[in-house]
Regions:
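N-terminal accessory segments that position/regulate proteins before the catalytic core
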Residues: 1-169, 176-177, 195, 209, ...
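Short pre-catalytic strand/loop immediately N-terminal to key active-site residues, enriched for Gly-Thr
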Residues: 186-194
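Short acidic/His/Gly/Ser-rich catalytic and metal-binding motifs that mark active-site loops
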Residues: 178-182
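C-terminal folded domains that constitute the principal catalytic or ligand-binding module
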Residues: 198-203, 207-208, 212
Length: 248
């Protein structure tokens, strides 16, 4: 039988093939923060839990959830965006004695390797462009980007029109050392699993506010990484999802 790349990945990330972890070697905990661009604009967000929702039936949310690629021209409010960010990466607490966060989504060993980048197209109070969520502070930072960053990222996502037509597109990146520090190469498995947890939360959160989501795995890794200004090795794009208001 052919030894495929996928088969090699599964084999080489088995426990029997792992080296000693950085944690076991006494290497310091990875940083939970990325540096901010010099002079970058930091934007306060409303509290994520402050959004007033109609009384919801959770079973109905789960049952009604579906992938939606067509959105209306209605803007997302800043309060709604804050709610979506809090529900997908929100920090509930930080341990006193170590840099470990408890969040609104599960993560292997509470490692939480992800950063959330946002392509903003149609959100009230925000200029269109590229942003990053500062989860520990519950703020946004606007990132330097070409004027046509929407077109660049749409092309990087194989010209899927719902990227351009979304109110916002979520780009999750993995800072791999946050996970591999403890779990070595097996940590790559966990990062992909964790991405599913985050995106499923987005689907359900969106359903509760009349929005639709389409998760995207079909993208050019190198083009997306370049557009987000990440190196593709230490930090790389791992999952994408478009979001906008549903048709009535």
């Amino acid at each position: 039988m052919e030894n495929t790349i996928g088969q090699q990945f599964v084999e080489m990330t088995k426990y029997k093939n792992l080296e000693k972890s950085l944690q076991s070697q006494g290497v310091a905990w990875p940083d939970l923060r990325l540096p901010l661009p010099e002079g970058a604009e930091v934007i306060d967000l409303p509290a994520g839990k402050a959004l007033k929702l109609d009384k919801l039936d959770f079973i109905s949310l789960v049952e009604q959830r579906e992938t939606i690629r067509s959105y209306t021209d209605e803007s997302l409010t800043l309060q709604e965006l804050a709610y979506l960010l809090w529900g997908t990466q929100g920090v509930k607490s930080i341990l006193d004695d170590k840099p470990v966060t408890k969040r609104t989504v599960p993560s292997a060993g509470s490692r939480h390797a992800f950063e959330t980048y946002l392509l903003i197209n149609n959100v009230e109070e925000l200029q269109p462009g590229l942003y990053r969520y500062l989860a520990l502070d519950h703020k946004l930072v606007r990132l330097p980007a070409p004027q046509d960053i929407c077109g660049i990222l749409t092309e990087a996502c194989q010209n899927q029109r719902h990227v351009r037509n979304s109110a916002v597109t979520f780009f999750w990146t993995a800072v791999q050392v946050r996970m591999t520090w403890r779990y070595c190469q097996r940590g790559y498995r966990y990062m992909y699993l964790d991405a599913g947890h985050v995106c499923q939360n987005l689907y359900l959160l969106a359903e509760a506010i009349g929005c639709g989501v389409c998760a995207i795995a079909a993208y050019d890794d190198d083009l997306v990484n370049a557009a987000l200004d990440v190196d593709g090795v230490e930090q790389f794009a791992i999952y994408i999802a478009t979001l906008g208001k549903r048709q009535k």
